[in-house]
Amino acid sequence: MATYVIGDLQGCLTPLVQLLEQINYHPEQDKLWFAGDLINRGEESLETLRFIKSLGNNATVVLGNHDLHLLAVSHGYGKLKRGDTLAEILTAGDRDDLMDWLRHQPLFHYDEQLNTVMTHAGIPPCWDLQKAQTLAKEVEDKLKSDSVDEFFATMYGNKPNTWSDDLTGLDRLRAITNYLTRMRFCDENSKLDLESKEGINTATKGYAPWFNYPTKVPEDCHIVFGHWAALEGKTQKERIHALDTGCVWGGSLTALRLEDQQRFSTPCSINRKNP
């Protein structure tokens, strides 16, 4: 039995099928983790969502910012952006089933046996493992609730950009969501810079990649995340694994086998909708 963590798909099903063939995936014994952003930009978003849902208990998913964007639009909040490839999902006959399944997925997953935690964007320096899990559950519970519309109505926005335990209500949920699904750079106090999106060397003065600061996550715990294609899969940290390698932009799709930290990748042709 093996567990593979796969980076951002963004609606690229064909490379996923190729990667599963490469790793000789056996559904009766192997498990797949997906680090979020299952859909959007790629031309196979509907097929990708259906495929991952069909994997059932073999798939563990955490939500990314594109997945949350789809959910918000499906609830009547937010607007489709140029380059989005979500219309086919929104008009599909099984749309409601897909959206219900998606909003019941977590933002945080921790496997005690593998001592590995997965979120879409990472874990900010100011949170320990238990705090990250507890805060993620606040958003997860809201997503599953009958009052989810008020969350989607206020989900978009870059503020608050500094964590405080005193945050309450929808501001608190937006901050948690941004840390877990949009974070790249922050300062030593975990204040977010959500404007900078390129590589490590492009940080605004006073900011650095979140994983370059001392972390409260135990030293023996591995962190796997996606979201940041400009890293090209590199963090220079032995236990912090970046898995978004830009599949939808013509890069590659990457899987990390957790049992031995071996990486597998398959090259991708550009598979995005032209803006």
From Swiss-Prot:
Its EC number is 3.6.1.41. It comes from the Bacteria. One of its GO terms (molecular function) is bis(5'-nucleosyl)-tetraphosphatase (symmetrical) activity. It catalyses: P(1),P(4)-bis(5'-adenosyl) tetraphosphate + H2O = 2 ADP + 2 H(+). Signal peptide: none annotated. It is an enzyme of class 3 (hydrolase). CDD domains: MPP_ApaH. InterPro entries: ApaH, Calcineurin-like_PHP_ApaH, Metallo-depent_PP-like. Keywords: Hydrolase. Belongs to the Ap4A hydrolase family. Hydrolyzes diadenosine 5',5'''-P1,P4-tetraphosphate to yield ADP. This is Bis(5'-nucleosyl)-tetraphosphatase, symmetrical.
